[in-house]
Amino acid sequence: MVYAVYVSVPSTAEKIADAAEDILVNEGSDAATMRRVAEIVGVSAMAIYKYFPNRQALLDAVAARAFRRLSEAWGTRVPDGSWEERVFGLMDDFLDFALGRPHLYTFLMTEQRPRARRFPGDFQGGGSPVFGALVLLVEEGMRDGLLREDDPLEVTLALTSTAQGLVQLYLGGRIGLDEETFRLLCARTTRRVLDGIRA
């Protein structure tokens, strides 16, 4: 008896995006040139343009894939935990991402990109699945009387900006702590912000 095994073979476009993402994760977005990606994939420098009209289109595809992957796992750490446990679970997800893949974090969250999401418009109504997970928790906290009534988007921005600012300082070498101690600093600082917005 013969069994057929079907293996999904990535398309050339997927291979190109995979190679660009690999370079970006390991070296940063500046290193992800069309020529370098083409060499890794094994296509000519001109052939890559059949799949992506320019470098920005390729980087946009990488960003969309990365955000999609992040949103699939974001917030699953303590799905049945208390409100506060879920908030800190999201913070841990964020820190795992930012500290574990700093080049990708920088590309997605802080580098200027033409198609990058902009606050507030692109963050409303689930426009950013990662940010949106915390917006939903903030709205829940307000409904349940845990947080003062306020603009959920702006409260979420206050919470995320604190952690992002600390990460920027840490990745820039401006905070002289090991990772474990830095994570504790992030938790304490987030708790201080939460204490300021509690009902």
Place the predicted regions along the sequence by residue:
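Amphipathic alpha-helical linker/stalk segments
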Residues: Y3-Y6, A64-G89, F119-V130, E139
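Short secondary-structure transition hinges
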Residues: D96-L136, I175-G176, E180
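Basic, helix-initiating cap at the start of DNA-binding domains
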Residues: M1-E27, A31-R36, I40, Q56-D60
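Short hydrophobic/aromatic patch on the recognition helix
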Residues: V41-F52
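Amphipathic C-terminal alpha-helical segment
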Residues: F97, L136, E140, T160-D178, ...
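Pre-recognition alpha-helix immediately N-terminal to the DNA-recognition helix
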Residues: K15-I23, R69, G89, D93
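Amphipathic alpha-helical packing segments from all-alpha helical-bundle domains
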Residues: R118-D144, L153-L157, L184-A187, R191
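Hydrophobic alpha-helical connector segments
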Residues: G75-L104, V155-L159
